[in-house]
Design a protein with these regions (language model features):
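Hydrophobic alpha-helical transmembrane segments of multi-pass membrane transport proteins
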Residues: 89-132, 217
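Hydrophobic alpha-helical transmembrane segments that constitute the membrane-spanning cores
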Residues: 64-67, 147-176, 217, 250, ...
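Short, membrane-interfacial amphipathic segments enriched in basic
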Residues: 2-44, 221-226
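Short cytoplasmic-facing helical segments at TM-TM junctions of multi-pass membrane proteins
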Residues: 122-147, 229-232
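Short hydrophobic alpha-helical segments within the ABC transporter permease transmembrane module
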Residues: 93, 97, 137, 141-155, ...
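Active-site cofactor/substrate anionic-group-binding motifs, chiefly glycine-
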Residues: 53-105, 109
Length: 264
């Protein structure tokens, strides 16, 4: 038992605050699933948020995906050359981009760009009492603001992930074609030969989980922002950091599950 400024804590202020945050986050997720499957369904707002997320991220994902494809191909070539296996380069890139790089790069970009935007927007509405005004007006702010944005990130990020994988393979082909005479048909055949249905399914699962994580974490931090503009900035920063941490944690867990299925 610890006491700070006359207030008693079970362990300490920081530890109690951590467990309280975990519990509140759990309640927030449970409330999301309850609200998501009850009417009204704001389909128009979900579509608007999907377009906004896509337009905000498309140019950056295009540039980053292309660069990742080029750089990863350049870095992989010397290692394969030492084993006389340069012909396996397209296959390596296809597997690496589809299994890991596409979903991971997309989610990290969206965590910084989309997640911060959602958290800042909801946080600003919270501290300026716009959310309270919606409740007074008999509008469910959780359903209209949170559910729509989480659904939008869950839908949009898988689409952006496959687009990023495509652009990454374009970047890889650009590098391969500059180094050796390889036709597009041969590159595509080699790149997709070793990609299984499990790889595509795992990539889709990762993107869905990452999209949901970014949406729910950013909405949670913004929805409960306090202490004015300073609190909004703090909530935005926490949303990005926590989203990225959870994405890497989920990456490890999903990879372990997929590998268990692959070799079962």
């Amino acid at each position: 038992m610890d006491t700070v400024n006359g207030k008693k804590y079970l362990f300490s202020k920081d530890i109690d605050s951590y467990f309280e945050g975990v519990y509140n986050g759990y309640r927030f997720v449970v409330r999301f699933f309850k609200e998501a499957f009850t009417s009204p369904f704001h389909f128009r707002e979900i579509i608007n948020q999907c377009f906004e997320i896509g337009l905000k991220s498309l140019s950056l994902i295009t540039l980053t995906g292309f660069i990742v494809g080029v750089v990863f191909t350049k870095q992989s070539r010397p290692s394969l050359e030492s084993f006389g296996a340069v012909s396996w380069l397209p296959s390596l890139m296809g597997i690496a981009i589809m299994r890991a790089l596409g979903p991971l790069v997309t989610s990290l970009i969206c965590a910084g760009k989309v997640g911060s935007s959602i958290s800042a927007e909801l946080g600003s509405m919270k501290v300026t009492e716009q959310i309270d005004a919606m409740e007074v007006s008999a509008i469910n702010p959780f359903k209209y603001l949170v559910v729509t944005r989480v659904m939008a990130t869950t839908i949009s990020i898988p689409i952006l992930s496959f687009y990023c994988s495509f652009v990454g393979l374009v970047g890889s082909y650009y590098n391969v074609s500059n180094e050796e005479a390889t036709s597009l048909q041969v590159f595509c055949h080699n790149a997709f030969t070793n990609i299984s249905f499990l790889d595509i399914f795992a990539s889709l699962t990762k993107a869905l989980v990452y999209g949901f994580t970014i949406g729910i974490v950013s909405s949670y931090k913004g929805f409960f922002a306090t202490h004015g503009t300073r609190g909004v900035g703090k909530a935005t920063n926490q949303a990005v950091i926590l989203s990225i941490f959870l994405i890497f944690l989920e990456e490890v867990i999903i990879v372990q599950i997929v590998n268990w299925i692959r070799y079962f």
